[in-house]
Amino acid sequence: MTNWTEIDEIAKKWIREAGARITQSMHESLTIETKSNPNDLVTNIDKETEKFFIDRIQETFPGHRILGEEGQGDKIHSLEGVVWIIDPIDGTMNFVHQQRNFAISIGIFENGEGKIGLIYDVVHDELYHAFSGRGAYMNETKLAPLKETVIEEAILAINATWVTENRRIDQSVLAPLVKRVRGTRSYGSAALELANVAAGRIDAYITMRLAPWDYAAGCVLLNEVGGTYTTIEGEPFTFLENHSVLAGNPSIHKTIFEEYLHARK
């Protein structure tokens, strides 16, 4: 039988150790490469951090599998058993250019169910963590259940790309929403955006394409505070594929989906 309390304690220890290693690396020169496009950055620290987790998971939990952004884990085609979904540095562009607004993100799943979610804002030493059925926390502070919000008073996290000409959604769909809400924010790290939704600092987050390692941990957090998340089509996540994401408190999710996203059909 899986000892989830032990896994939770060990994962928290590892994520803080990895954060300390990243902090130390900020005083050293980075090796920066590009992946799918010139703005899709990866550094030697991304790769080293992913390897840090893989080495420890394989040694401590040899039966567990790993889905990592940098491709050093396993080839995952199902979520059978225990699977760690890891983004060693979510917000690499921020890490390179700002040395802030990035996070380590780890979701741990068993047979497709999110059991543990960890998002560590390294620079601010804020660890958002959730254990299925036991609540969500920021460090030692328990996160409150999300409150209902009217759209006119909502803070929406959205990248400006989605209200300009792009190939994923007509810019006219979301522009009226941006005008209607109280304000918008963009942090450049999907994990931190989802953590901020779970913490009630922002009311909703919308984006057109995220990989499983971008959203897995955040979804575990949202489960524990009563948040809602789907694709922009209203479909559930597979946690194996790239998806669009609409996440927020239930009332805001419902309003955005019904009045803006579903209406576009």
From Swiss-Prot:
Binding site for substrate: E69, I89, D90, G91, T92, R185, D214
InterPro entries found in the cross-reference section: Inositol_monoP_metal-BS, Inositol_monophosphatase-like, Inositol_monophosphatase_CS
EC number, UniProt record: 3.1.3.25, 3.1.3.5
Positions of Mg(2+) 1 binding: E69, D87, I89
Cofactor(s) listed in the protein's UniProt record: Mg(2+)
One GO molecular-function entry: inositol monophosphate 1-phosphatase activity
Domain of life: Bacteria
Binding site for Mg(2+) 2: D87, D90, D214
Pfam families for this protein: Inositol_P
Keyword line: Hydrolase, Magnesium, Metal-binding
Biological process annotations from GO: inositol metabolic process; phosphatidylinositol phosphate biosynthetic process; signal transduction
PROSITE patterns: IMP_1, IMP_2
Phenotypic effect of disruption: No visible phenotype during 5 hours of growth, decreased resistance to oxidative stress caused by diamide.
Entry-linked CDD domains: IMPase_like (cd01637)
Keyword Transcription: no
Gene3D superfamilies: 3.40.190.80, Fructose-1,6-Bisphosphatase, subunit A, domain 1
Family, similarity comment: Belongs to the inositol monophosphatase superfamily.
Name of protein: Inositol-1-monophosphatase
Organism: Bacillus subtilis (strain 168)
